[in-house]
């Protein structure tokens, strides 16, 4: 099964290495958490919003508040995004000018749902600007949604790379090994979106892509979510069934219901 599950698995596997970082490509890929990752919850909130509302900005705020407060747990409570934690906990409704990589991660379902590049960009902006109204926060979300849309619609890696370089001004010519040597933990769109793309661009399979993203030693869960989403959008790449089963076995029924419904409606 491909689709947003590629992002959920990537984030879940990367979660163990968000704090305890690794540069080892052959890291342990087993997922042993009893709950979905914080990134996965935000992704599900977006999918729920796209399927079950009129897709207004206020309804998206409500969906994020609902899902993120429902799964408010432990040290992985929305990573290092302190402002977002407060925004969720206090049920705030105003943006705070962030350009953190959360906007680029939670937008992933938009890339599957959108019927055109323009629609992907339009709705990516809506999902970003409720919190991440900084230009780089919006651009990161649009870059990810439009990349997923383009991959799904058969554009080649080189075509997508050229588009991102032209429209988003990202430097995507950095060799993967050079990126890995210098990559640091920095939870911003300008840092994470190009890095995630470079991992996918240089990958040969879904697992290879996620391993490359996690072993950058950066914001492992979010970068693996984005890179995994790119890989899963490619019809020539299969998300391994054993990874899907391993990651989702403990997830709640309501979480899985949204995941399955979105797959049936938009990912086939």
Regions found by a protein language model. Give the residues of each.
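Structured, active/binding-site neighborhoods that engage oxygen-rich ligands
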Residues: 1-268
